[in-house]
Amino acid sequence: MSTSNFLPDHNPVMMLQTPFHSRVAAACEMNEWGAWQGYTTPNCYTNVEMEYFAIRSNTGVFDLTPMTKYRVTGPDAEAYLDRLLTRNIAKLGVNRVAYMVMCNDAGDLVEDGTVFRIGEQDFRLCTQERVLDWMSWSAVGFDVDIVDETADVAALAIQGPTSCRILRNMGFE
């Protein structure tokens, strides 16, 4: 492909593919693709209406690799997240996940997503937007490390009313 048709200041960039891309591409009957956080992702697989009702009555699997993932560790990780999130992190058990909302000091919504408790002082936050600068600024006074793991951690969401049964049948508890 010749790049002579691009504007002089245009910098063509290859879109990233998730580790699940080959399976996703095989399932993408509509062949309608878009961009999400620099990754090539399907806009839908078969039919938007069918997909909506499938996840409400059965199970849907989604490639969430493009979502932003932060690892928060250190002696003050729980205290830091207890300040940052509108959820009592002390009540979140190890190997559990919960919905979370991040708010600034004025109580304004910054971002929402999920928080995974990997260990006593080891957490992963999964968000749509990139908020590392704000999280780092909010960590002043806390002994924590915050690392953007987005490029290193792939993710699948398995959702719907039959998802637990399917996972149990696969050997997961």
Where do the PLM segments sit?
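Acidic, proline/glycine-enriched N-terminal capping motif
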Residues: M1-C103, D108
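Acidic, low-complexity central loop/insert segments
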Residues: E111-E173
